[in-house]
């Protein structure tokens, strides 16, 4: 007989259990913390050597074992400290596509007490320059393409550069990974505490520039442990998974999202480090390539954004490949259409649909749902397991009654410390240890969370957060633009795409093509509006003077405003 959800949480996190919770204090706030969590991530990386000759990373035709990865991590740690002079608390930026070197760089940086700055590999030169300046990075580890984009910034800021997989001769003073990595060197060690900073992940900014979300070692480890505990809690509380038809296979992950995103970094990559699991790395998303890798590598866990699940099950090549190894298909980053839940369940023989509602600011952890629970609650994002707590609050920050709508707030040891160099944004987002999500929703009597709308002016495009203010800031740099309002336009595959309505200055002209050419060098491609409306009259505003973006969106959807498409 299954337990209630509360009983399962109590049993899994009780005294004597691996996931035992005890009273603790984090940044002056009392909360439950994991008794048996490692003190810092360096212990996880050092411990991974114990997995020895087990396969860790698979990339194209390359196979790297845990022991081989550990040797390279130790060598890079030595290089960072002994050659580049990296000290505890220094920021080291990583900017590259999904390569094995990203994984090893992350581990080496954090294990010497430095802070890993994860840079979006789709950024333009201007965006990359801002993050290097804002973070105060002293070293950049990057691939060839990111070096070409950021080289001038590094020269200007006197940043040391290490290039992986260089495709052409490098300028004097720029190091090549394969030539300078001192294999055989021992790890220099570091004195690291649980509440020391470990990572900075940049999120799109609500006021024009990205914000660096800072996580401590404790926060990241709390998230990893909470993910592990949650699986047991769900099964003990009655969530039924499919009976496997066929042989059991070892748990493994396919990396289909960028490592600079929290999903790729924490629940996927770091889970493999902790549990000694295989991680098959995709350079970029391609559904047929993913199907081929799933069959060849016998992948069990497919964790991405709903767009990728949609691509997978709708691929014309789906029936060509054996996907019977899959046990979990889904992820987070955006709400999932209810039709997709059923389609994944029907098409993936042994795979269970799943959804997680996490954020960069929660280290990807949050309410989640899978298996029979998801099929019976397809519009919910699930329930939060301990030590996370969820509340729905009104505009006065007071909890609302069950079933009523309000803003969703999170609490727990997995939350970020705050935003780098942004005490204003930190104070606005984190109040008495509780983090505001920016999403509107409700909780039902059984604790299921339902996300209904957004407080934030944000578009979710294929799992990427795009803030209207950031895109508008770039658009307003064009001299012809008088007014600009950015909004989301529904899209079957992407969830949403970016739209904009523009009024040009008197006596000036601007075509959509001219706008696209202007923005191509200003902001990352995924932020550039693909639906552009050039208005002949001022944009609609409310009594407070704010643009009526939902009204503009509806006009574009209905076709009463004609948008040029890219």
What residues fall within each predicted segment?
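Conserved AMP-binding/adenylation subdomain of ANL enzymes
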Residues: 221-256, 260-300, 315
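Conserved AMP-binding A3 loop
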Residues: 65-67, 198-226
